[in-house]
Amino acid sequence: MELKVLNIQGAETGEVVTLNDEIFAVEVSEHAMYLDVKAILANRRQGTHKAKTRAEVRGGGKKPFRQKGTGNARQGSTRSGLMVGGGAIFGPQPRTYDQKVNRKVKQLARRSALSAKAAAGQIVVVDDFSFEAIKTRPVADMLKNLGLAEKKTLLMMPHHDNVVSTSGRNIEKLNVMVADQASTYDILNSQVVLFQKGALQKIEETLG
């Protein structure tokens, strides 16, 4: 697949790049993407939820009333899970939600995500650029010129650029990442993947 390279003004530079078919034209594996995204979202969970059991809540040491003769159901503690103020029965406890996905499956998932974006015409290539100062306006203007101002955009960079990443931080629908760090979730969670031209080589080194 060939794509025209645009500049930050949104005009064609006259240059054309060829996307690697091994990355941008593979058969899309929805199952691999499902496994990877599921693991990514699960691994974000802290797992620090906790409810106290009847052994951990305060009070309840004394039998509330005698065993027989009151007409009430027998109770040995006011902190039973059946009582108001009692401990939780099988309540949530701290745990890890981490899931492991094999490297080959992760690679396939990322290739599938990029291939799906390419097939849908949701990949744009812009010539390499840099800004002198940390300002939101130049990045916002670039997105507007490219027709991406209202679209959820993933900007893929060839390397970390503090000026660009910080400048784009205040733009709600923009996510700036180094190409080899973008996950399957990041790709699928965007409407358009905007590649700096140099980032294509970076992604080929990672997934090629």
From Swiss-Prot:
Residues 49-78 are annotated as: Disordered. Keywords: Ribonucleoprotein, Ribosomal protein, RNA-binding, rRNA-binding. GO terms for molecular function: rRNA binding; structural constituent of ribosome. Pfam families: Ribosomal_L4 (PF00573). GO terms for cellular component: ribonucleoprotein complex; ribosome. SUPFAM superfamilies: Ribosomal protein L4. Gene3D superfamilies: 3.40.1370.10. GO terms for biological process: translation. Residues 69-78 have a biased composition (Polar residues). NCBIfam families: rplD_bact. Belongs to the universal ribosomal protein uL4 family. One of the primary rRNA binding proteins, this protein initially binds near the 5'-end of the 23S rRNA. It is important during the early stages of 50S assembly. It makes multiple contacts with different domains of the 23S rRNA in the assembled 50S subunit and ribosome. Forms part of the polypeptide exit tunnel. Part of the 50S ribosomal subunit. This is Large ribosomal subunit protein uL4.
